[in-house]
Amino acid sequence: MKKVADKQILMAADFAGYPLKEEIKKYLEKKGWTVTDVGVKADSDPNDTELMFHRIGLRVGSMITEKEFERALIFCGTGMGIHIAASKCPGVHAGVVESVPAAFRAITGNGVNVLAMGAFYVTPELGKQCADAYLYNDFGSGWEWWPDFDKFHQIAIDELNAFNYEEYKANGFKVKHLGDCHCELYDRPEGLSPVPLMCKR
């Protein structure tokens, strides 16, 4: 598997997301990242129907499912359609973000392995900041002050990975618990940034 710790990232975009993807791709490559791009390229044929947003989303999702890559960045006009498609693949936890705090929380709290952005709403500069927040942090990063933060959120990830709708329905629409953890919310200590960019890579 190509891992973020080794500065390996999968990227893809449809035609609407292409301009934003290109800006972020160049930015990351300048920082030493190896980018594997499986979407629209400069010379792509606009009539190639394999490059429709949902087909690219499924392509990326399948590469995460097959453990070719640990994480991916994907782009379309809104980020929504390509994210819905990628989410159809088993084990994919995709999120759409339009802010740096959302990108930070997507990885640190939800373990998102596919992050989507929309070129209609996210500027290149904001997109670069979102990419940094996502790629330079890991699950649980920056939440050490919240007791059991990672345990609480890992239960959700595990139950979502194991989710089977027919079993859920047969169980009276109740989730099969794979663990439990108290749900107390904690206030962030005063002066602590909600987005501590922990640039480890």
Predicted features by range, described:
Residues K31, C89-V92, N110:
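Short, structured coil segments at secondary-structure junctions
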Residues P46-L58:
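Structural motif
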Residues P19-K30:
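Short, solvent-exposed amphipathic alpha-helices that sit
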